[in-house]
Amino acid sequence: MAQRDLKFTRNIGIAAHIDAGKTTTTERILYYTGISHKIGEVHDGAATMDWMEQEQERGITITSAATHCKWMYRDQEFTVNIIDTPGHVDFTVEVERSLRVLDGVVALFSAVDGVEPQSETVWRQADKYRVPRLGFVNKMDRQGADFFNVCRQVREMLGGNPVPLQVPIGDEIDFKGVVDLISKKAIIWNDEDHGMTYDTIEIPEELLDDVNKYRAELVEAVAEYDEALMEKFFEDESSITEDEIIAALRAATIDMSIIPMMCGSAFKNKGVQAMLDAVMRYLPSPADVEAIEGTNPDTGEEESRKPHVDSPFAALAFKIATDPFVGRLAFFRAYSGTLDAGSYVLNVRSGKKERISRIYQMHSNKQEPIDSIEAGDIGAAVGFKDIKTGDTLTDMKHPIVLESMSFPAPVIGIAVEPKTKADVEKMGMALGKLAEEDPTFTVKTDENSGQTIISGMGELHLEIIIDRMKREFKVEVNVGEPQVEYKETITKSADHREVYKKQSGGRGKFADIVFEMGPIDEDFEGTGLQFVDVIKGGRIPKEFVPSVEKGFKEAMKNGPLAGFTMDSLKVTLKDGSFHPVDSDQLSFELAAKMGYKDAAKKAGAVILEPIMKVEVVTPEENMGDIVGDLNRRRGQVNNMSDRSGAKVIKAEVPLSEMFGYVTTLRTLSSGRATSTMEFSHYAETPSNISEEVIKAAKGAANE
């Protein structure tokens, strides 16, 4: 097999905030590069890259799908490995793993929303691994789209040096093309063929001033980086050629001194091919990346491996996945040398040799078997007996340990228990496999309750783990789902008479009660039913009175508003009558149940919700944001104090507002604040919240 020239390989990731259009952009790339003949839409659940069922249902990307495609640029075929990374903060681990093995990133921004929190997180992660970037401002066809505003945010919020390479033609819904500032040509895409073709036209007159201004800025930015160009720039700016600009821009991008910025609308098929051209033009190939550093495990000395097929083999496993057809798949990036299917490698962590039975190139979750993999490529292999994320795989005779990856600790936990005896063993195995795949997911046993507690990076993360246990491992579990237990109570007194009569030949039914319903007395201890019998003169025989009390107690299990348990209730039985033949205990019990329903409606029933005591420990600079967030959650801040250099905020917040709080707190404080929460008391919900709760409860009851 002829050796491929590494110059024509690109390992790139597409990274951004959730909903900036990452998966749609990747789908367009696959369409234009000929891998996919039908464009998959995320909102249809048909996107090729979102291969897990959960992803197609939720319209978000959870696992980094790896895909391989080809692209022609300047009559040269390039090989591109693309990793589509998730943008949800719960799945930061996937982004971290991907960036570790990529050579370049297309940082995607929404033209409307600009730099969002996850864009910032991904940006910092890319800085950590020194990954060069190209900016693509997507959704240019949307209302409020502003390309240059996003460029400004990249400078101000991310500290990058964004340099626009294009000026958009047309605003929002009229967005139809761009002016290329390097070639000074205007490009208009044709809608008839999904933007496959475009027309080159003269620059619209109204854009000439903008084009000249931004082109001058581009040339100046590039000249600042390249001394030879700087001299030309001062002597005669017009003598700088297109190729010189491209060469200097490429060097500056790889050096992370400049972020080339482009724009388009992936959904409307505009701008994706130009972005692909820019990937080939400006982002590094494996050959541009310096030799990878590592440690020789035998000598402890630092060593480096050049990205060349003649060097000894070295690779890093960056993801382990369980595939239903081929078993355990290890995704890895080959940094040096060649690996043939059927050969042996050394896993430096375990010290064991492993036989690689098959090597695959991945297209989302479909595998294409290949004979060998070379330096600079990304692939997946099966046959490993013991492999973990971050393991180094090397030539048997030339071991090297590459820098592994570090992952954050989990932040949220829930209890799970198997539904049946048959599920017990399967659950242990499934959780073990899932923990093997995902370093931010942990499993432990609670010492007090003996329950299995699973922990992860957020509620969504754990939902998906439970879903995968069911779908992939056929394990049914009961989950300690954090759900709010609302209650109901009444706020005023109401008098009511209930007569229960049933005559249907033979012996009938009869009961007649007169009672007052109201809130419990202040000195009544506890909750539940306060029942007072004030009947005089045997109007209701004594043996029937306990049945009336029993009827009310039973009825309190269902509140009149939404069917929640009634927290407390006082019933005073005042009067009534009975029939010597037809009255019995059941008749009086039913009369109480029926009377309760009508009386409770008249007695001003309200919804109660659990209020939690919350304590947050935070650095001072985040305190304002955190207090503001607690107020937005209907929280009441009771106390603020100092504790060993940090601020402590004590508040009471409704439990219903606290779901997802750990994740928000992590975002607000960049992971530096911590919180604890415990139950305090029940309190009445505001009317707007009550309406929502009642509506939701009735909706659930009707399903």
Swiss-Prot record:
Localization of this protein: Cytoplasm
Tree of life domain: Bacteria
Annotated ranges, domain tr-type G: 7-287
UniProt keyword terms in alphabetical order: Cytoplasm, Elongation factor, GTP-binding, Nucleotide-binding, Protein biosynthesis
Pfam families: EFG_C (PF00679), EFG_III (PF14492), EFG_IV (PF03764), GTP_EFTU (PF00009), GTP_EFTU_D2 (PF03144)
Binding site for GTP: 16-23, 84-88, 138-141
Molecular function (Gene Ontology), one example: GTPase activity
Alphabetical GO biological process terms: ribosome disassembly
InterPro entries (UniProt xref): EFG_II, EFG_III, EFG_III/V, EFG_IV, EFG_V, EFG_V-like, EFTu-like_2, G_TR_CS
Main location: cytoplasm
GO cellular component: cytoplasm
HAMAP family assigned to the protein according to its UniProt record, in alphabetical order: EF_G_EF_2_B (MF_00054_B)
Main function: Catalyzes the GTP-dependent ribosomal translocation step during translation elongation. During this step, the ribosome changes from the pre-translocational (PRE) to the post-translocational (POST) state as the newly formed A-site-bound peptidyl-tRNA and P-site-bound deacylated tRNA move to the P and E sites, respectively. Catalyzes the coordinated movement of the two tRNA molecules, the mRNA and conformational changes in the ribosome.
Family: Belongs to the TRAFAC class translation factor GTPase superfamily. Classic translation factor GTPase family. EF-G/EF-2 subfamily.
Record's protein name: Elongation factor G
